[in-house]
Amino acid sequence: MNYAEMFSRVEGCAFVPFVVAGDPDMETSVEIIRTLVDAGADALEIGFPFSDPIADGTSVQEADLRALNSGMTTDDCFRLIERIREFTSVPVGLLVYYNLIYRMGADEFYRRAAEAGVTGILAADLPPEEAGDALRAAERYGIDQIFIVAPTTDNQRLKMISEVSSGFHYLVSVMGVTGARSRVEESTLELIERVKGAGSLPVMVGFGVSQPEHVRMLADAGADGVIVGSAIIDLISKNLDDRERMLQEIYEMVRKMKTAAGGSR
């Protein structure tokens, strides 16, 4: 299933959870992702752990560290995606830092991603002006190349991003790093309208979305999807000594978020 098919199926706003591959270890990570799907996730965003995640706050940094300390490598991350594909066809997006792509080479990274079953790739620190290799590889292997749209993105730059993006726009709701926040800014709601008016791609909102009421506000403002990461990762961190409780709390949170979003599953 690609993103266009997913958005066409969803009634209301898509709910997309984000977790780090291999957090806290490979086997638990697979069960967490299975729980996300069972709870109704419309798509998945999977982060490849990185030692210097400059766009991420404390929760994701700690998740990256747990995954790396468990021995996760880029090869392991692709194997994790292959295991995910054994039990779900929902779109799987990668959120990575470009150094991981650069070290392997864009063509090889995207080839591996396509073979594993990846739908789209967002390199958090890759501006579209420098994305030639990634864009060529994405086109070659049939992967959507996704870029961040920030509150500071002006209309001219937004037009340029729209021309090279596919899949969806990843709209950053706030300036700064990832992490759960207490409210949705009014400027975010206005930004959704501006981005949707700039092109035909769906808009997914991430960074700081942590409560069902946030999801409902964003859905009402016209967001096509919401991406929730730190709030889920915090449940992983809180329950490292009790996997069953961890999975149950994650399931319950996703059900609440999914209900707030509205949807078909």
From Swiss-Prot:
Any GO MF annotation of the entry: tryptophan synthase activity
Record: active site: E45 (proton acceptor), D56 (proton acceptor)
E.C. designation(s): 4.2.1.20
GO cellular component, one term: cytosol
Catalytic activity: (1S,2R)-1-C-(indol-3-yl)glycerol 3-phosphate + L-serine = D-glyceraldehyde 3-phosphate + L-tryptophan + H2O
InterPro entries noted in UniProt: Aldolase_TIM, RibuloseP-bd_barrel, Trp_synthase_alpha_AS, Trp_synthase_suA
UniProt entry tagged with the keyword Lyase: yes
PANTHER family given in the database record: TRYPTOPHAN SYNTHASE ALPHA CHAIN, CHLOROPLASTIC, TRYPTOPHAN SYNTHASE, ALPHA CHAIN
Name of the molecule in the record: Tryptophan synthase alpha chain
Gene that produces this protein: trpA
